[in-house]
Design a protein with these regions (language model features):
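Short coil turns that delineate tetratricopeptide repeat
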Residues: 120, 152-154
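Alpha-helical linker/edge segments of TPR/alpha-solenoid repeat scaffolds
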Residues: 166-194
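Thiol-/selenol-based redox modules, centered on thioredoxin-like
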Residues: 53-138
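Alpha-solenoid helical repeat scaffolds
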Residues: 127-128, 160-163
């Protein structure tokens, strides 16, 4: 098994590298300044993980990837984290490979991962333009497209988080809390770890 982490921030290593240094990471670490990973795997929040086998097949789509379970409280609103279940399933897959109860069939994978809607595709294109303008030193134009992406797909927390990062940690935290407290749905979707049918030998 190999763990690969991808920190996604238009600020590149300057913005994201310090977190790897602080963690003394012993696994492969990448800095994704263009958010290519989120785009490819439809990530909308962090931490999110995908399982990819030795053949390059994606075994499970993006899911909240915590390592322990707990319930946090922010402004009187609960944030439930399901880490223990995720790690247990991951260990089963590492041990059993394609025979794991948690390795999804192609049909089940397709059922869980839907193509982006036209609105979501426009949001993604707007976000990519924002990233390009930000890295080209044109923050005003970047801000216009960051805002457009967030309006089109308000459920994508990565869009919000990246734009908020330019406000400083304190203001970004306040914006996150305001949006979090207005949520009608869970911040992290419940992990669908119901075991899939074993693959035939």
């Amino acid at each position: 098994m190999e763990i690969v982490a991808a920190a996604q921030d238009v600020g590149g290593e300057t913005a994201a590298g310090k977190w790897y240094d602080a963690a003394n990471a012993t696994f492969t670490t990448l800095v994704d300044a263009k958010h290519a990973v989120s785009s490819a795997f439809q990530f909308v929040n962090v931490p999110t993980g995908v399982w990819i086998d030795e053949r390059g097949r994606v075994v499970r789509p993006g899911e909240p990837a915590w390592t322990s379970s707990r319930t946090d409280n922010f402004g009187g609103k609960a944030l439930v984290i399901e880490g223990a279940e995720y790690v247990a399933a991951l260990r089963d897959w590492v041990e059993n490979g394609e025979r794991s109860r948690y390795a999804l069939s192609d049909a089940e994978f397709a059922r869980r991962v839907k193509p982006r809607s036209p609105t979501e595709m426009e949001a993604e294109a707007s976000f990519k333009l924002a990233v390009w303008f930000q890295q080209a030193g044109k923050p005003t134009l970047a801000g216009k497209y960051f805002e457009r992406a967030q309006q089109l797909n308000p459920d994508d927390w990565n869009y919000h988080r990246q734009e908020w990062s330019f406000s400083g940690d304190t203001e970004a935290g306040q914006k996150w809390l305001e949006k979090f407290q207005k949520l009608d749905a869970p911040y992290y979707p419940k992990i669908q770890m119901d075991p899939a049918s074993p693959q035939p030998k």
